[in-house]
Amino acid sequence: MDSNTVSSFQDILLRMSKMQLGSSSEDLNGMITQFESLKLYRDSLGEAVMRMGDLHSLQNRNGKWREQLGQKFEEIRWLIEEVRHRLKTTENSFEQITFMQALQLLFEVEQEIRTFSFQLI
């Protein structure tokens, strides 16, 4: 796993957890939870690719791993739209920078998960 990706996830999660967005704090907590879940999923796929023979193990653990993969891509698309919406509505520069970095990270992670999944197929 790329150490820059790890630190990017940690940095963005830390900064998002410090934000106070008024009535939408529940939505933000949901985004943070999904970011954390996405990071764990990306890490597990990356580890499976590193072991290359782990495809059968992955399939045995989760017989519907392709369906789960599709769900993760849906989550990524939802997060991208949510982050874009936040970017358009916030005027706070700290929040804008955080959401811009989160958006870039989501695009990078989406590409990494696509790469990992093609290697596993």
Swiss-Prot record:
SUPFAM superfamilies attached to this UniProt entry: Nonstructural protein ns2, Nep, M1-binding domain
Keywords: Host nucleus, Host-virus interaction, Transport, Virion
InterPro entries, alphabetized: Flu_NS2
Impact when changing K88R: In strain: Isolate MA20b
Location (main, coarse): virion
Subcellular location(s) per record: Virion; Host nucleus
Cellular component terms (Gene Ontology): host cell nucleus; virion component
Motif (Nuclear export signal): 12-21, 85-94
Biological process, per Gene Ontology: exit of virus from host cell nucleus through nuclear pore
Complex formation: Interacts with protein M1. May interact with host nucleoporin RAB/HRB and exportin XPO1/CRM1.
Name of the protein in its database record: Nuclear export protein
Native source species: Influenza A virus (strain A/Hong Kong/1/1968 H3N2)
